[in-house]
Amino acid sequence: MMASASLLIGSYLLLLMLLARPLGKGLAHLVADRPLHGFATAERGLWRVSGVENQGMRWQRYLLAILLFNAAGLLLLLLILMNQASLPLNPQQMPNLSWDLALNTAVSFITNTDWQAYAGESTLSYFSQMAGLTVQNFLSAATGIAVAFALMRGFVNREQGELGNAWRDITRITLYVLLPLSLLMALFLVSQGTLQNLHGYLDLTTLEGAKQTLPMGPVASQEAIKMLGTNGGGFFNANSAHPFENPTALSNFVQMLAIFLIPAALCFAFGDVVRDRRQGHALLWSMSLMFVAAVVVVMWAEVKGNPHFLTLGADSAANMEGKETRFGILNSSLFAVITTAASCGAVNAMHDSFTALGGMVPMWLMQIGEVVFGGVGSGLYGMLLFVLLAVFIAGLMIGRSPEYLGKKIDVWEMKMTALAILVTPVLVLLGAALAMMTDAGRSAMLNPGTHGFSEVLYALSSAANNNGSAFAGLNANTPFWNMLLAFCMLVGRFGIIVPVLAIAGSLAMKKVQPAGNGTLPTHGTLFIALLIGTVMLVGALTFIPALALGPVAEHLHMSGH
């Protein structure tokens, strides 16, 4: 088992880095806002027709463009979901969504969360899935990458204050990155057996004589961007555990690669943009070390399983509950860590059925801000916030003014960094407290005791950090939970984007200071250790008390302590 686990983790990381390096080079080209060879004329025509000016924006204008763009997407998606019964491509005659579920779903998809308080195959029409959810999967991913581009430019621009043009960034990211990759991914998934049609559902008679309905639909086209954009919202309720979404072991492995592909490539792009590849490599090393540690813990916990299984007469204590036999424990554990380290939230196994420790690690990966590779764009700018915090702590220890990449880190940057890092913990902890204090919150819990609290904590962690996965034992489709989680998703997304762009704008106004003898190297082993320690320390201080009431207590109870 250890050899299989090592081979799986090693082959995954090797292929990931081989694919991410060339993509990172292309992303760096987009950050520089240079026209692509052969597309310059078409681009100029597109900008003229759309009225987009070829000039940079300061951080306030960049932020306003991002907010207006996402507000328009929210309104359009809300209208589609609340009127889907009157729209085309609805062969199953799906009714309109209630206002609270429609609002929750619209907020979920424009924030790249893809939290789903519904079952897609029994709730949404094909039009809602294609024109509503799939479109927002592209646009929310492009938004995150655009913000990361703006922050990168903040580090390299000198006394300009401009961060690029948000409209150009979102358009170019969608056309040159997300669409081509999604097309290739969709074709691959179709070759593996993923559905892609507009047929009505099939009514069949099984060999036992029972009646069964097989859902159909344009699955592969949504599945591709769901993974590449770290969106995670499944066409079916079972998500990537469903054989119509994820048919084979090969499709499962490629889906895992797709989740981390753009986040890893952005780290390589960061090194190219700042003209020091070691900076990007340091981020990748930090992320990879934390990732491997998390995978090892989850695999160990699930293989060790539950000792009560043996007392009940099972052949093994290994925990196969909630997992597909075609994927097994190792692939399910790896997928769980990948999807929660990123802001994806897609699942090929039910996280609610993991052991207490096996479920706690994915929850904790979300709680630290999903900075272990993280979401497309959000993972990079989230980790760079921790880099600024680590540089500040190091500056306090050695008595020097903190600086990073030649830019001095002042009070303004640290205030914005602290604000961004504190947004999601406040949402999670206060939201969990509110849910446990109210009848409307507690009534949705289908399990009592420590595991019930873990389900509540997981839901708030997932929503506030824009992940979207869930412990399924929570009945979240109620007005209370739809509104609470929608609020957490909105604030968790844009409450971080605002200070990140403010930091980028401030850095873009500064001179680059030449490195001196006392400058802290931010690419060596010492800084990697400091960065990992900073992430771990913030996560530990913030969430250990809450985790102790949930998964830790559940594990001790399971172990007989």
Swiss-Prot record:
Main location per the UniProt record: membrane
Topology relative to the membrane: Multi-pass membrane protein
InterPro entries membership: KdpA
A single GO cellular-component term on record: plasma membrane
GO MF term (any one): potassium ion binding
Stretches that traverse the bilayer: 1-21, 62-82, 132-152, 173-193, 253-273, 283-303, 327-347, 356-376, 379-399, 416-436, 483-503, 526-546
Keywords assigned by UniProt, alphabetized: Cell inner membrane, Cell membrane, Ion transport, Membrane, Potassium, Potassium transport, Transmembrane, Transmembrane helix, Transport
Compartments reported by the entry: Cell inner membrane
NCBIfam families tied to this protein: kdpA
Main function: Part of the high-affinity ATP-driven potassium transport (or Kdp) system, which catalyzes the hydrolysis of ATP coupled with the electrogenic transport of potassium into the cytoplasm. This subunit binds the periplasmic potassium ions and delivers the ions to the membrane domain of KdpB through an intramembrane tunnel.
Protein family membership: Belongs to the KdpA family.
UniProt subunit comment: The system is composed of three essential subunits: KdpA, KdpB and KdpC.
Name of this protein: Potassium-transporting ATPase potassium-binding subunit
Gene: kdpA
